[in-house]
Amino acid sequence: MDHVDRILEQWNRERPDLDVAPMGLFGRLARLRIHVAREIEKTLLAHGLNSASFDVLATLRRSGPPYRLSPGDLIATTMVSSGTMTNRLDQLEKAALIERSHNPDDRRGVIIALTPKGLALVDEAVTAHVENEHRLLESLDAGERAALDSLLRKFLKDFE
């Protein structure tokens, strides 16, 4: 029995007329999100990053050489506002993890690129991040992981 089961028992006792089964699923998803986010933040913090800065650096890294994107592309990929992105970029530039340069294709535009320091850091951090994710999934065997992934993918498609 977990925390969510106790909540469901209470609702079943207080409102037996309601089918509260969906609360179990959404409650567990919400609680897992909190626990997983906490574990991810700890791993990233060990590399001097938080999830927001890691998101930007990882997006640039995933883009492939020369690891450059426009701010608009970063905003679209990370789904944050331009003001939020500007703040993130300012912090990363101050730490010498990214650099801004003029876009050669649009003189009014800017290109964001990983610096060598940023590339090295994100490579270290993503390695630790993936190792941490494997650790977080250790209680599930390969078949359970595949089944969970398939079900979550199917469910997510309803929203995206």
Predicted regions and their residues:
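Pre-recognition alpha-helix immediately N-terminal to the DNA-recognition helix
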Residues: G24, R28, D55-T59, A120, ...
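Canonical helix-turn-helix DNA-binding module
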Residues: F54, P66-I111
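N-terminal leader segment of winged-helix/HTH proteins
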Residues: M1-H47
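Charged, amphipathic alpha-helical coiled-coil/dimerization segments
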Residues: L89-S150
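N-terminal helix-turn-helix DNA-binding core of bacterial DNA-binding proteins
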Residues: V20, I34, R38-S81
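Alpha-helical hairpin
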Residues: L18, L49-S51, L114, L140
